[in-house]
Amino acid sequence: MAASVHCTLMSVVCNNKNHSARPKLPNSSLLPGFDVVVQAAATRFKKETTTTRATLTFDPPTTNSERAKQRKHTIDPSSPDFQPIPSFEECFPKSTKEHKEVVHEESGHVLKVPFRRVHLSGGEPAFDNYDTSGPQNVNAHIGLAKLRKEWIDRREKLGTPRYTQMYYAKQGIITEEMLYCATREKLDPEFVRSEVARGRAIIPSNKKHLELEPMIVGRKFLVKVNANIGNSAVASSIEEEVYKVQWATMWGADTIMDLSTGRHIHETREWILRNSAVPVGTVPIYQALEKVDGIAENLNWEVFRETLIEQAEQGVDYFTIHAGVLLRYIPLTAKRLTGIVSRGGSIHAKWCLAYHKENFAYEHWDDILDICNQYDVALSIGDGLRPGSIYDANDTAQFAELLTQGELTRRAWEKDVQVMNEGPGHVPMHKIPENMQKQLEWCNEAPFYTLGPLTTDIAPGYDHITSAIGAANIGALGTALLCYVTPKEHLGLPNRDDVKAGVIAYKIAAHAADLAKQHPHAQAWDDALSKARFEFRWMDQFALSLDPMTAMSFHDETLPADGAKVAHFCSMCGPKFCSMKITEDIRKYAEENGYGSAEEAIRQGMDAMSEEFNIAKKTISGEQHGEVGGEIYLPESYVKAAQK
């Protein structure tokens, strides 16, 4: 589709008038029609799922830790055959899942906020870490407990005109979600409220997603990671996608995007939402396109509106909508090396070219906002014209859309809708700062959400690395949410192993960014692991790592015996060449010889060498070279004498 858009560009008439003017949109009267649309959608999907045509096939497990079957198709979307993932205890040895209780003053609700406690040896205090793994040992057919039901019920009774976190924050109200996020981040709830009120942070939390454990996205908070999952027309199943959600969040994914484009889109999303404790985002244009049999020209506002309401009713926490792909911007991509690479962007662009009309998402932006502020669906304004290659980075088309994102952001804030802005893409490192600078300025410091960016195009199969480099860079500059890239990027649909690889790569990038921003928890985590490493507390080192399973398996490949877990060396250097063991020996020597500390031993050693240097003056140079100090260059005769 993107190719056909690219080929059609030269036929575009560029003298469009009045596109810069803000359209006059009628007041929305969406609410009376919501139930009708939802009922119609439910009826249609019920009919679609009555016929069974798929068969099951299996892939062999790719790791010892993943013995669950990887399904290619779903036989019965109403009752999938879910497979369990490895347990929390298997993934995180020496860790327990704990909860901190805090009381929401206004309601009296007791909130139980999760965290992961790593139990350390050697008298070291336990280390507490942010946890995204969600409730454990849950029957996926039943789904997670409805954590937020009482919170939502209480606020609904207040009869407020809007239901968004931004609305409450502007009123000076600290919601249960804000207190929950503040507790997770170890910050003052009032600070959370003020950042949400100013639009510098968002708490994606659809009032219909009752299973959600709230989290916050903003540049003054921990950098977060999003994991994309979803089926395609040729691969995956409901079982596999729910497994990916559970697996991604186990390893630290803070949000999930369901980008399904294949069969059972509605049912897949339903099962994901009922089993996800993290916010779930979508790109609604994908399902809208499926409703018109994949023909972009058959799309219209009514189909798109119906899809938005359907997904909001299910509990989707944020929508990616490419409303910044304007008709007049499409010709700007004509000379690109890779054209329009965004799926959503290309769909909107093709529709615009087919009718020579403005993007219907832009034209109906106020109507979209009216839907979002009734459910508290946050908007992730899509970057449909993002660069798809290093060659196209930071071009006119990309920044033209970003400027429009700023306009759409301010309009959303007027209706108390939470917003973040999506960013590139493929950008070399020296061009990354310009992206962050322009986004902060043009979008009034709304959270930035970037796909990487990939810093080079030469490494298919390793794009989780090429992009994590860019993600760490732009995260340190202020990007709040990093959309992961897996090793399969540009090659195929990622499986569960790819999902884990992508999440871990991006947790590294996010943590590196937190360190650069001098976040105190980030530094404490590094210090705890470094101390365990230096003291040869191998099990503590594994437990404190992002991926204990992999760290332990790599160590045990060459030193599998239990005794190796207490050895003061690894297979890299062996017992004689370990630098940390040598340093430990120096400290032990200093203590045994009464030097006190290693620092004192070093000081005394330097004093001794200084004295030896001064003695050299008396025995070699005498008055000929001055009365004080030794000589930098010793006479040849002295060297020969010393050698004898």
From Swiss-Prot:
Substrate binds at residues 228, 257, 286, 322, 342-344, 383-386, 422, 449. GO terms for biological process: response to vitamin B1; thiamine biosynthetic process; thiamine diphosphate biosynthetic process. Binds 1 [4Fe-4S] cluster per subunit. The cluster is coordinated with 3 cysteines and an exchangeable S-adenosyl-L-methionine. Zn(2+) binds at residues 426, 490. It catalyses: 5-amino-1-(5-phospho-beta-D-ribosyl)imidazole + S-adenosyl-L-methionine = 4-amino-2-methyl-5-(phosphooxymethyl)pyrimidine + CO + 5'-deoxyadenosine + formate + L-methionine + 3 H(+). Strongly expressed in cotyledons, leaves, flowers and siliques, and, to a lower extent, in roots. Expressed in all green tissues, but not in roots, seeds, and petals. HAMAP family: ThiC. Catalyzes the synthesis of the hydroxymethylpyrimidine phosphate (HMP-P) moiety of thiamine from aminoimidazole ribotide (AIR) in a radical S-adenosyl-L-methionine (SAM)-dependent reaction. Homodimer. This is Phosphomethylpyrimidine synthase, chloroplastic. It comes from Arabidopsis thaliana (Mouse-ear cress).
